[in-house]
């Protein structure tokens, strides 16, 4: 993003061109948030994008995080027949939702065979050839869980690094571009939408 409502683009052949418009829409999407103790390799420890395009169904999957992304994939893989385990740092599933919703969801998931560890911290993860392990700390003890894949579902991070926001003066806070009710940034003619 450049000033004077210009965007610099790099074409497939390497040529760099400037495009100018009356308004600029910033819609750069998001990527999986990466935990230091859960580095994603895209094969055994994956993010939400890889979880949508696996070549084969895992027999066992550990899902770290129980927000919207984690819960959706837990339901999906359980329905497809995978053995699903959820690890959640907070004291309940979907901690942003009402407690009644969390309780009903947990009851339903357990009834369908999903294993749930709440108030549990992921200490470490390790790839062991064809399998992967997660070392977790619960209220009572440390234990190791094994699976074919670990899905990191601990949130998303906006793709706004190094795109020129600072050069133009567009304000961001906590990885989010600040917008008004019409999605316009603090700089007239620049809008931000999506993740």
Q: What are the residue ranges of the model-derived segments?
A:
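Helical element adjacent to the flavin cofactor pocket in flavoenzyme catalytic cores
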Residues: 15-18, 27-32, 105-116
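Conserved N-terminal Rossmann-fold NAD(P)-binding element of oxidoreductases
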Residues: 26, 64-65
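Glycine/Thr-rich phosphate-binding loops of Rossmann-like dinucleotide-binding domains
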Residues: 34-36, 71-72, 77, 159-162
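FAD-site-proximal beta/loop scaffold in flavoenzymes
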Residues: 41-57, 146-195
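Rossmann-like dinucleotide-binding cores of NAD(P)H-dependent redox enzymes
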Residues: 52-53, 58-62, 68-142
